Amino acid sequence: MANTTFKGTLRSEGGYSSIATATGTGTETTQMSISSADFASLDANKLATEAGTGITGGTGTIYRSSVIREGGIIKTSILIDLTGLRSTASGDIIGVDGTSNVCHIGQITAARNGTILAGRMTCFEAPTGGDPDINVHSATEGTGVEDGAISSLTETLLVNAGDATLGSVVIFTAVPAADEFQYLTLGDTTNADNTAGKLLIALFGYEA
């Protein structure tokens, strides 16, 4: 269908949706919608590659991502409930216990997330069960698994956070490069599943 340009007010009583249609299959995916209840949803605005199943497969685990462009600033958010994810030993990757599923929490790309300039991690619920000393690394590989040493990857420590406590905010001392994957890692040793813990990672970038 050709482009259509309207001048003046466009009105729709039942809401509005913008869709994308997959080439070949014709499958339609909602990119953006505004419901008749005044609820706006930007469905397509998330990481191009979200967390591996070594994160999303946890029992009780919640993972969501968001990418929003406001003017010249691109904000990437990753929200995680750690429930069901295993902590093991210092320097190891956090994820679902006893699996070989990849445990990154998403990939940063210049096309989607821009060039990252700064980052922070906020704790909305202190981790319990597992160890609360949780750090964030990036790595060029997306193959890291639970209980694997982050040092076995080509990695960079983004923040040495110390123990996460309710309301704690830590600022990244390094930022991920384009195409790198993010990982949650342990800064201490407690070999157990998390029974609580809510973290929000926010990365701020720009289009170079």
Predicted segments with their positions:
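Fibrous stalk/shaft segments of extracellular and virion attachment machinery
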Residues: 22-64
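Beta-strand-rich interaction surfaces with strong enrichment in secreted/lumenal proteins
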Residues: 90-94, 105-108, 170-174
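Short, intrinsically disordered N-terminal pre-domain segments
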Residues: 1-19, 66-72, 207-208
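Extracellular receptor-binding modules and their adjoining Ser/Thr/Gly/Asp/Asn-rich linkers
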Residues: 61-97
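Terminal beta-strand-rich extracellular "head" domains
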Residues: 126-177
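Beta-rich globular "head" domains
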Residues: 98-138, 200-206
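Ser/Thr/Pro-rich, low-complexity mucin-like regions
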Residues: 192-194, 205-208
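Noncatalytic modules at the cell exterior or secretory-pathway interfaces
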Residues: 172-193, 197
